[in-house]
């Protein structure tokens, strides 16, 4: 019934829209770590990956409001992404309780089973 994603109007807005009407259910200005990127929904949660610094936010998929459950930053173990070069443009994926994230020439796997 709802769609979650980033607003292009202002940096740092994660938002929830009613699918049928396009009405904004909520819009949250998130810290600079999460101003633009990719969102994946799984098991009632949103896995939000920032394209610049590799921040990952776990947010409850709830049309009543923004509820952050946690965050972490991908380790900077690649030389292909630095302050002046490279973006994390891959999409997070959750399969069988495992969160997969790719950063340039690396892939990370995290256990996200509750």
Please place each PLM-identified region on the residue numbering.
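Noncatalytic, solvent-exposed loop/strand surfaces
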Residues: 1-114
């Amino acid at each position: 019934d709802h769609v979650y994603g980033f607003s292009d109007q202002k940096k740092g807005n994660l938002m929830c829209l009613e699918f049928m009407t396009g009405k904004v259910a909520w819009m949250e200005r998130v810290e600079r770590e999460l101003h633009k990127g990719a969102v994946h929904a799984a098991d009632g949660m949103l896995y939000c990956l920032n394209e610049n610094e590799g921040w990952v936010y776990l947010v409850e998929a709830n049309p009543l409001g923004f509820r952050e459950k946690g965050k972490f930053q991908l380790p900077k173990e690649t030389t292909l992404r630095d302050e002046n070069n490279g973006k994390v443009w891959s999409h997070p994926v959750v399969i069988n309780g495992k969160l997969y994230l790719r950063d340039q020439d690396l892939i990370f796997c995290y256990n996200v089973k509750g």
